[in-house]
Amino acid sequence: MIKARITVTLKNGVLDPQGKAIEHALAGMHFSGVGSVRQGKVFDIELSGTDRAAAEADLKAMCDRLLANTVIENYAVEIA
């Protein structure tokens, strides 16, 4: 079995209203020193099999086709 983590984040320059709302909420809760906040998504996926190259190709295809909007989001695939 192969375990992977996919992290999806907005590309630089793309507005992040949810991140901005979190940033303002943290300031309102008196957390000092918080600069910019960007929000993203994390997916933990388990795949059957042991072929890491095939797993990486499948995971990237999952991102390109469903998990990430590649017009406005970047993704990173980590295989454990």
Residue ranges and their predicted role:
Residues M1-A80:
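Long, contiguous binding/interaction regions
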